[in-house]
């Protein structure tokens, strides 16, 4: 009887079964670092400095504003909205930021899973149905306002992560 493959498998078993979990503190630190990186990328885009994140712009009400208390699910939902907006913009300035938002959402999902509260999948948002019309009318304004508000939201998220937000 040939037991070669079985012996090799049994010999490798201790190595295969040893999986070290990533400490949640490391995930939280990586999340904060990525948020700071995204904020820096937004700062590097010079025209985003001209609008306050609190300023109201007619027709751009669908872009989320600041939220003082954020849960992990609210953070994920907010980032999903910004990601949809940024991927709709033709500007090359926002491609990397959009990719970073996807990575940030993945880190938030890890944080949520560590607290046993998996985040629901975010569907296409109804409030963004009119995005195409708004982009045709005011492409530049949409980019500036979206990036400015995203920056403010990310800074809120950074503060909230220090307080260990709930589900």
From Swiss-Prot:
Signal sequence, renumbered to the chain: 1-21
Top-level taxonomic group: Eukaryota
InterPro entries in the record: 4_helix_cytokine-like_core, Leptin
Short name of any one Pfam family annotated for the protein: Leptin
Subcellular localization: Secreted
Biological-process GO terms, alphabetical: activation of protein kinase C activity; adult feeding behavior; bone growth; cellular response to leptin stimulus; energy reserve metabolic process; intestinal absorption; leptin-mediated signaling pathway; lipid metabolic process
SUPFAM superfamilies: 4-helical cytokines
GO cellular component: extracellular space
Keyword Secreted included in the entry's annotation: yes
Disulfide bonds: 117-167
GO molecular function, one term: hormone activity
UniProt keywords, alphabetically: Disulfide bond, Obesity, Secreted, Signal
Entries under PANTHER family matching the protein: LEPTIN
Function, as annotated: Key player in the regulation of energy balance and body weight control. Once released into the circulation, has central and peripheral effects by binding LEPR, found in many tissues, which results in the activation of several major signaling pathways. In the hypothalamus, acts as an appetite-regulating factor that induces a decrease in food intake and an increase in energy consumption by inducing anorexinogenic factors and suppressing orexigenic neuropeptides, also regulates bone mass and secretion of hypothalamo-pituitary-adrenal hormones.
Family to which this protein belongs: Belongs to the leptin family.
Annotated protein name in UniProt: Leptin
Gene name in the database record: LEP
